[in-house]
Amino acid sequence: MQTKHKGDRFSRVVNEFHGRETPERISTGGYAALIDHYDLKVPLPPKLTGISEHHHRVDTDHWLLLTPRHRPEDTLAGHLEFALKWEALDLGVLASLFEVVSDKEFSALVRAEPTGAYARRLWFLREWLTGRQLDVPSPGKVRAVPVLDPEQQFGLATGIPSSRHKVIDNLPGTPAFCPLVRRTATIEAQIAKGLDHRARKIVGNTHPDILTRAAAFLLLDDSKASFRIEGEQPSPQRALRWGKAIGEAGSRPLSVAEFERLQRIVIGDSRFTQLGLRTEGGFVGTHDRRTHEPLPMHISAKAEDLSSLMEGVVAYDERVRRAGIDAVVIAAPLAFGFVYIHPFEDGNGRLHRWLIHHTLAAAGYNPPGVVFPVSAAIYREIAAYESVLESYSRPLLGLIEWEPTRTGNVRVLNTTVNYYRFFDATTHVEFLYRCVEQTIEQDLPQEVAYLEAYERFSTGLQDIVDMPERKIDLLHKFLRQQSGRLSKRARTNEFAALTDEELERVEALYHDSFEGLVLPRPQLES
């Protein structure tokens, strides 16, 4: 294999890197130096590290600048070690790098320091990503080190030892699909809140009848919201069917067959939709009105890569199921990875959000019988949701070579499978955690409090006037619409039978029952 690179030097002095401005003039190091030197066609890591010309450290959202004394040796080995030490694992960059660095050159790198922790980790990763064994001797009796640094990124709590490399494989996925999540202060703070325990406390303090009604409302609301996100307005029957599927999430193991079963439920009328894995290209976007050529916002994985990628998704779910990783940290990479792959012609978005419910339920994160209305929270945060989706899909557009087909589709011309196997899902976890927090701190307690207030109102009303439940619902609806007052129209029509004294008592009862409550949003209409 011929090594491709720009000149002899790896590092160079820059004020910006591939369109990303630097806080000051720096020398590239680690992944930036490797991407530049080997001309790797990869999405930039969310955060890069460089060497400042000054003796101070700078830490921003997209750059970590270290002092001159941290400058790595300007070699392949030097920048790889620097990357692992300061930038954690980026499997997409490493996979691309390993395609252009020969086995012979890489074997020499490992042989130069056979007992070194970084060399052993890189040796394992090289063989793990390429599927080819290197001609490298055993490192002898040395302490096994984790492949993924658990202080930098989330990995398996108990990894799998590799006696050949003297490392512990704690990667959350397999070479077929392995998105990673960095440990950030934001995620650590979200985990520390113990939102799952907060939800169980709310449920434990709620009467079973109230809880059953609240759970049913939240489940249906989530189902409707998931359709609304896709710009659809489902019939009541279709929303109920999908709500039932959401309620069963986590009860069956994942498989391609299970995804196809769920697709049939979510699509309903499949006369004009090809069910099952795509057999041609796919994209998200629009068409030029004059030429009908695609205007993609996101390009899906190639059809010939779908079987391997979906096997990877299933394997990831199995591998992390009892991995000791926080459930939300697992759910986001799985769900967003699925939607980037976009394996089906239709239904991908709703299945992607179903995967969130699947992961949380399988991990026991939500109380039994209660579904957090994550889709409803996403619908409220739709602009942020789209921004998170585009944080990875937009950079990919510049890396994917494609041409339009005669049917208005796209045909991808270059190799893209690794773009869907490996990506940084940190931003996705932070967003999903905000949505989960909303459902637990707002939706669930507000719905419970509202139903408890309604129960007080309904029970108290029977002491004023005998009224069937259907009429109580209508009276409550009118009072809610007018902030606790009955309109003249309702007073002279539907509730003309109420005396003035009864009406005064009814309005006072409504005020006493609902005073101080933050009322939940009205349910999305079907």
Question: Predicted regions: what is each one?
Answer:
Residues 1-345, 350-526:
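FIC/Doc superfamily catalytic core
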